[in-house]
């Protein structure tokens, strides 16, 4: 027999506060509205989000989808009690995976799960998601907030993101004409981005430093703040370069697995990327991680971006035009190497020179 009357249980007694959920929705509505774009101008709160491809200017589009998370970088945000930027990371990890296929990000949805919903914390997280969406030019058209007592400890949370983009048919990347001798350009990262943070946290533990300690590699910043520097969003500069020059043959987002795992994903089997490690300008954060953790260069390269967040492949005659277009949008461009012939069974990424860590 179910309980009734004044002693009956409520959902709140079980740890789920519907009123807090409703309060969060009201808090985030202005941030969500700020992401509206052609094709998406609805309000959140419906059973699903809508997007009008024709209103967005597409005629014969191919849809491209990606989903990702932020990983254990969230643990630093939780422990440091700084939640404003992890939403940017969430968007970046998804939309950067869209643009490498030549697609314009159109809309984004998030999943936010927590042990106990704190509206101000949730609003900070979603505010970051909205900021990332604005930077990428995509609309935040919906999401799910799940308060899950017993699944997560109070204060803990996890994030997942889902992005959909589009490219006109025939405009997808990589192109089919990547050739031996093509030049490999690298775009600078903003820091560690959102990969390798289990190793980062282990190194910080070994260092004995707290998240509020001065960052040894970033003057004027606390350690937690410096490590939480959000992932760079490359969407608008790359889309502009694609449209202005028509010369980009391939793009690779340097995430987990670094150069050796990510670059070969966009190459034909008969070609490999030869990277001059001496050309990589390694930011101080990576030097500190390598030195403090005793991490060898090979392990750094397969775990972190080491200062290069995006790879661009172009024909040699187009290097100047593509570099100029990207630099005009604020990107730091460096020539990293060339495409070379690859023997059957050989690695898709090979190195020359030494990584200066």
Curated annotation (Swiss-Prot):
Chief location of this protein within or outside the cell: cytoplasm
Protein name: Phosphoribosylformylglycinamidine cyclo-ligase
Catalytic activity: 2-formamido-N(1)-(5-O-phospho-beta-D-ribosyl)acetamidine + ATP = 5-amino-1-(5-phospho-beta-D-ribosyl)imidazole + ADP + phosphate + H(+)
Pathway noted in the entry: Purine metabolism; IMP biosynthesis via de novo pathway; 5-amino-1-(5-phospho-D-ribosyl)imidazole from N(2)-formyl-N(1)-(5-phospho-D-ribosyl)glycinamide: step 2/2
UniProt-listed CDD domains: PurM (cd02196)
Annotated source species: Rhizobium etli (strain ATCC 51251 / DSM 11541 / JCM 21823 / NBRC 15573 / CFN 42)
Catalytic class of the enzyme: ligase
Molecular function, one GO term: ATP binding
